[in-house]
Amino acid sequence: MPYLSTSDRIFFKDNGFLVKHDMLTDEQIRKAQSVIWDNLENETEVDRNDPATWLRDGPRTPSGGNHPDIVGTLMDSPVFSMVEELVGKDQVKPPGFCGPALNYPSGVSHWMPPEEGHLDYLPPDKENIGFTIGGMIYVDDVSERGGGFAVWPGSHLQALSLFQEHANDLDQLEGLDAMDLVPETKPQIVWGPAGTACLWHGNLVHNISKNCSDRIRLALIIRMRHMEFDRIRNDFTGDPWKHWEGIRQL
């Protein structure tokens, strides 16, 4: 039985992201938290039992992304199956790494959404850092102003339109900044309880938001590629969803 409804897939196609809750068991959450805290305490002066050590305003990335209890949040949960329901069964390379992505409390109470976002890559992607679909998994509760992932709905369609326009001269896009796309929507913050997951299109404008809570945002970030990514990564001709089986079928 599929995890995603037709409405889910249509929402992803139109908005470039999809949020789902309750993707992890309590045991998966507990084990993932333990790995993150253990590595954080080994590598920094942060003490999980002393919130005064958590005020480090900004993102941090401890090690542990290849630990089985971290990778299992993707592969042993519904999340990777949902990825395949969008891109295609056996069409996505299973990643062996899910990067811990932390956002420390800022220590201030005034919160505003981020003014700008970015793309992780732009074609022709000569540095080979691109990806097909991204995943963000929260392994602790994240409040609306708690440093959640920010996405600009529909900005992937603007990016794809631009890339199609330059499909035969992608070198012309070198040096372009994501904000040159001028997203037509305001950012939406992804927040929710531990076990919340967000999938997003590789060409969606996104960012991190300011953490005005008293908790470290504990999240995992994953960038996944189509099996034929090296061949198709700069193919922006024709149907932009031709390599997404779950979207092309709509």
Question: What feature does the model see in each segment?
Answer:
Residues 17-19, 134-138, 151, 187-189, ...:
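Conserved hydrophobic/aromatic beta-strand scaffold that supports enzyme active sites
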Residues 112-120, 169-185, 235-239:
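Short, surface-exposed loop/helix-turn segments at secondary-structure junctions
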Residues 112-113, 117, 127, 145-151, ...:
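A short secondary-structure junction signal
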